[in-house]
Amino acid sequence: MKNTVVVYLEHQIEEMGVPDHIANALKPHLKIVSRNNSVSIRDVGKILSAVTLLSGDILQNGSYLQGWIDVLITLLVSKVIRPDLHDRFLSLSFTEDDLEDYFDATVQRRTYRIDDEYNAEFDHYTMSQFYSWLYLAKGGNFPDDEDGMKKFVGGLFSRWSGGPDDPQSIPRKVKRDWLELFKAQ
């Protein structure tokens, strides 16, 4: 069953004409973060207001890679519902516990198989968000990469097989290019 804020978000997205590439990232994001964080109808309004103020061509151009859009959505939403984490996302100074808490990314939700059995609690979006931010914080390095997570997550941020050149700069670039409303020329 959907919670009230997700239903409200979906209605407002439709009413406001939020572009699909933004809406399709915002809906699952709010769904997972509302499991473990307090999100009000007013918060949804603040988030959607921020969406309408995005700069650059992010609203018109749906060809950006999913990882970049997910970083944008995390920065937008965390600034409203978890301002204590927003700066840590931006500077990549969060802990794994912060990620688990914000995304409700329990081991069960981010692990496809447990003891060689399919895990019914696995949630692909939760796993993707958790490991994307871990990838950025670790500069694209996963020491124990038995599941090929580095290649999967790197593909969310770069069309090239090696991943992005400087993963740790991505949150700052997203802020600079899409979130900063007023830039000195």
In which residue ranges do the predicted regions lie?
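The feature marks long, low-complexity, polar/acidic/proline-rich intrinsically disordered regions embedded
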Residues: I13-Q185
